[in-house]
């Protein structure tokens, strides 16, 4: 299976606080890894820009997954909403409730969401085994800390970015100031009426750099 990450991100790269997870029913994109504590105050920058085209893309992407991989916090958010029977019949919930789920965690010992496997110990090795299996897609939603960990170990095959036309100006960003370098091939590009761009990239290893000239 190819490992695909799917992330809501602002133009300046912020992933934090794209929704207020404590306000109203949770939506299928409520998967922030960071809870916005401390000085962050600009919650909810994504919903005013989410349109039907983006929502359709999100639903279709969930439905094509063969399995899901989460960090603990994102897993608990999903388990507390979709896993608790929110919005019965929704295709997102159907995918999440009927397909295998894996959680990278050293502290979660008793997952109560059916068909969940906790990955601890040699997490990189376990994820490598999942990637080696035949099939379609192992998807990572939200889980920013996990995504950065996966990128550090070059375990990501595809990166999907839902880029919202807003500069948040503060908050945790998907890509840190210092991290691994990564070459990308653009394999799909969509835009929506409210100005989201949805880019799908295939990772290609380390990028090429211009050679120094005399």
Feature map (PLM): residue ranges:
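Conserved catalytic/dimer-interface elements of ABC ATPase nucleotide-binding domains
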Residues: 160
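Portal/gating segments that form or line small-molecule/metal binding sites
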Residues: 1-155, 165-214
């Amino acid at each position: 299976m190819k490992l695909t990450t799917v992330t809501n991100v602002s133009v300046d790269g912020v992933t934090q606080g794209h929704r207020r997870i404590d306000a109203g029913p949770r939506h299928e994109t409520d998967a922030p890894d960071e809870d916005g504590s401390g000085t962050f105050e600009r919650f909810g920058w994504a919903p005013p820009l989410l349109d039907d085209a983006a929502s359709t893309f999100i639903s279709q992407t969930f439905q094509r997954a063969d399995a899901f991989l989460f960090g603990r916090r994102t897993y608990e958010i999903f388990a507390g909403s979709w896993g608790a029977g929110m919005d019965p019949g929704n295709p997102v919930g159907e995918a999440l409730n009927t397909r295998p789920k894996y959680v990278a965690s050293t502290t979660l010992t008793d997952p109560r969401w059916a068909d969940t496997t906790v990955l601890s110990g040699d997490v990189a090795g376990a994820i490598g085994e999942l990637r080696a299996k035949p099939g379609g897609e192992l998807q990572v939603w939200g889980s920013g800390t996990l995504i950065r960990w996966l990128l550090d170990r070059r375990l990501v095959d595809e990166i999907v970015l839902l880029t919202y036309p807003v500069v948040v100006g503060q908050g945790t960003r998907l890509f840190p100031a210092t991290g691994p370098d990564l070459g990308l091939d653009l394999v799909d590009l969509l835009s929506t009426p409210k100005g989201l761009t949805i880019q799908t990239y295939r990772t290609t290893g380390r990028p090429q750099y211009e050679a120094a000239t005399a």
